[in-house]
Amino acid sequence: MLDGPTHLSDGVVCLTLEQARPAEPDRDWPPEYRYGIFLEGSSVRVGEIRLRVGRNKEMLQGGNLGYEIAESHRGHHLAERACRLVAEVARHHRLDPLIVTCDPANIASRRTCERPGATLLGVFDVPPEHRMYSEGWRQRCRYEWHPGRSPSPS
């Protein structure tokens, strides 16, 4: 059941729930929250973050978290802030640790994983039978993140 918070804020960014999708067992897809990321006090959507609630083989490739920040708002650690906020929803569902994956070539995304204390488990090949392979992905960094042990933002 998706019964997490609809609004989260840290005083800099706020997350607003845009969609709560139930599980799709035929796709082996867990329930998912999609939050819009906004600058506090603004109606301008600067990105989105998704939290997939569950553990399965799919999460090893796609991870529990996915995030995107509009190009014009990158470089201000907004994705990291959103990750820290959505960790509250993960805790609500007793989801710890979180698996976070990213493109090995995306240094900014790797830093977004590392700054709050995620541990790199390795760089893994995407299996040819996985949907991400058909989308062009060949490798993923896989991180494990224990949000309750995260260092404070700097």
PLM regions and their residue ranges:
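Acyl-donor (CoA/ACP) binding surface of acyl/acetyltransferases
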Residues: M1-A23, W29-S154
